Swiss-Prot record:
Keywords: ATP synthesis, Cell inner membrane, Cell membrane, CF(0), Hydrogen ion transport, Ion transport, Lipid-binding, Membrane, Transmembrane, Transmembrane helix, Transport. It is a multi-pass membrane protein. Gene3D superfamilies: lithium bound rotor ring of v- atpase. F(1)F(0) ATP synthase produces ATP from ADP in the presence of a proton or sodium gradient. F-type ATPases consist of two structural domains, F(1) containing the extramembraneous catalytic core and F(0) containing the membrane proton channel, linked together by a central stalk and a peripheral stalk. During catalysis, ATP synthesis in the catalytic domain of F(1) is coupled via a rotary mechanism of the central stalk subunits to proton translocation. The record marks 59 as: Reversibly protonated during proton transport. The chain crosses the membrane at residues 4-24, 53-73. It comes from Pelobacter propionicus (strain DSM 2379 / NBRC 103807 / OttBd1). GO terms for cellular component: plasma membrane; proton-transporting ATP synthase complex; proton-transporting two-sector ATPase complex, proton-transporting domain. NCBIfam families: ATP_synt_c. One of its GO terms (molecular function) is lipid binding. It is found in: Cell inner membrane. This is ATP synthase subunit c 1.
C-alpha cells in the first residue's frame, strides 16, 4: 500500500469511528428526551429545546471528525514528503 491509499483508509476509519460515537450519543439523548416528555408532557418545550442544544453539541464532534478526515485527504502536510520519497525510490 502506498501513502495515499493509507490516507484514504485512515480517513474512512476515522470518519466511521467519529460518526459511530456521535450516532450512539444522539440516540441516547433522543431516547431520554422522549422518555422525559412521556413522563411530563407539560415540560415538552423545555425538554425539546435542551435536547436540540445537546444534539448540536454532539453533532459538532462528527463535524470535527469530518474536518480532520478532509484535511488528511486533501491538505495533508506530509504529502510533499511522501512524494519526495517516491521520487527518490523511483530513481
Amino acid at each position: 500500500m502506498n501513502f495515499f491509499t493509507m490516507c484514504v483508509f485512515g480517513a474512512a476509519i476515522g470518519m466511521a469511528i467519529g460518526t459511530l460515537g456521535t450516532a450512539i450519543g444522539q440516540g441516547m439523548a433522543v431516547k431520554s428526551a422522549v422518555e422525559g416528555v412521556a413522563r411530563n408532557p407539560g415540560a415538552a418545550s423545555k425538554i425539546m429545546t435542551t435536547m436540540m442544544i445537546g444534539l448540536a453539541m454532539i453533532e459538532s464532534l462528527a463535524i470535527y471528525a469530518l474536518v480532520v478526515c478532509l484535511i488528511i485527504l486533501f491538505a495533508n502536510p506530509y504529502k510533499d514528503i511522501a512524494l519526495k520519497m517516491v521520487e527518490t525510490v523511483a530513481k
